[in-house]
Swiss-Prot record:
Cofactor binding, note field: Binds 1 [4Fe-4S] cluster.
Domain of life: Archaea
GO CC field: primosome complex
Protein name: DNA primase large subunit PriL
Family in the record: Belongs to the eukaryotic-type primase large subunit family.
Region of interest (Disordered), ranges: 345-364
Function as written in the Swiss-Prot or TrEMBL entry: Regulatory subunit of DNA primase, an RNA polymerase that catalyzes the synthesis of short RNA molecules used as primers for DNA polymerase during DNA replication. Stabilizes and modulates the activity of the small subunit, increasing the rate of DNA synthesis, and conferring RNA synthesis capability. The DNA polymerase activity may enable DNA primase to also catalyze primer extension after primer synthesis. May also play a role in DNA repair.
Subunit structure and binding partners: Heterodimer of a small subunit (PriS) and a large subunit (PriL).
Transmembrane region(s): none
Requisite cofactors: [4Fe-4S] cluster
Length: 364
């Protein structure tokens, strides 16, 4: 790749080697006045990741300064994400970087996608239909399963694909989508990197800005750290699902996923969730544990969130909504709000109790 493409795809091995050859240590990357634009861009791409989309510039091959800024902003953004070391941020960042690459890959020539796939140790053979001249790729089914398994659309299921002699035929855009998944996994699994404490301290002006945006986004998504699981504060849909499980009702797959991912996200352990399904009529502990560990990200590092309220309604899983349901968009948002209200009331009561004690007449 030329330097312009390395800047657009900074996660490839060649880009890492090129940056290493420039001799920019983390300390120099942080302190050099000449690299201020790279630091600003590095912070910007993390904030853009929180918003869901990293905007990639398109510098010409002659704009060496802009190319270097974009190229060096990537390792600096990784430093910032690592210093904050928040799983939610790491997942959002990796996904946004991968999505940005996907949009670019769709415009590239087939040979470029083939070369990029090779960097991920994926053998994608180019095939041209002799009659229509359409371009396809042949991908070994093991590579296909590895990359397509997290994708939810039924079209990605192996049983719905054409396979010949162990190879799956896919379109150029489909290969770009699978490469997006490979990119996401590479970035997510490589974070956090080890960053010296003094470097993280020097990054505080940048990480504070990102952390502020991170907390806003967590509130929006209903993501937070819960001190303990409070079942009396669950949204009606989850309460009903748990009641059905305890009554021996076999939940639909979509509701089972929603309930499991909700419980994992509020802090229940895999063992605790497995125990809840122990009464289910089709209970298979090994299979159940595998499914729950997958949702919890035990092996992949990706913890799945429960579906939004709109999706719950679409699948018929929204049951007995109450007044609070009208003001939230996500089951985790419902739970977060009720936890916040309960904590606020407890704090107010404790404060009032202290004030009352101070105003009491001491015994005579």
């Amino acid at each position: 790749m030329d330097n312009r493409h390395l800047a657009l795809y900074p996660f490839v091995t060649e880009a890492s080697e090129y940056v290493g050859s420039l001799g920019f240590s983390p300390d120099k990357l942080l302190s050099s006045r000449a690299l201020e634009s790279a630091r600003i861009r590095g912070r910007e791409r993390v904030i853009q990741a929180l918003e869901g989309e990293i905007e990639k510039p398109s510098p010409s091959s002659s704009e060496e300064g802009k190319i270097l800024t974009e190229l060096l902003s990537y390792p600096f953004s990784r430093i910032l994400v690592s210093c904050i070391d928040d799983p939610f941020l790491t997942r959002k960042y990796a996904l946004a970087e991968a999505k940005a690459a996907y949009h670019l890959l769709k415009t590239q020539q087939p040979e470029f996608l083939q070369d990029l796939a090779t960097d991920f140790r994926i053998n994608a053979e180019i095939y041209e239909n002799p009659e229509t001249h359409d371009i396809f790729f042949d991908l070994h089914f093991t590579d296909y399963i590895k990359l397509a398994s997290p994708l939810k659309d039924l079209n990605w299921k192996l049983v719905n694909r054409k396979m010949k002699k162990g190879y799956v035929k896919i379109s150029k855009e489909e290969l770009a989508r699978l490469l997006q998944e490979a990119i996401r996994l590479r970035i997510q699994n490589s974070l956090p990197v080890t960053v010296p404490k003094e470097i993280c301290e020097a990054c505080i002006p940048h990480t504070d800005t990102i952390s502020e945006e991170l907390e806003k986004k967590k509130t929006e998504f209903g993501v937070g750290e819960f001190q303990r699981v409070e079942s009396d504060l669950f949204p009606p849909c989850i309460t009903q699902a748990i009641a059905n499980v305890r009554a021996g009702v076999n939940l639909a797959h979509s509701m089972r996923f929603a309930m499991t991912s909700f419980l994992i996200n509020i802090g229940m352990s895999v063992d605790e969730v497995v125990a809840m399904f122990n009464i289910s009529p089709d209970f298979d502990e090994e299979k159940t544990r595998y499914q729950i560990e997958h949702i919890a990200g035990t092996s992949s590092g990706t913890t799945y969130k429960p579906p939004s309220c709109n999706t719950m309604r679409t699948y018929g899983n929204c049951s007995a909504p109450d007044e609070l349901c009208k003001g939230v968009k996500h089951p985790l948002g419902y739970y977060s709000r009720r936890v916040w209200v309960k904590n606020r009331m407890q704090n107010d009561n404790e404060k009032g109790h202290e004030e009352k004690k101070e105003g009491e007449t001491p015994p005579q």
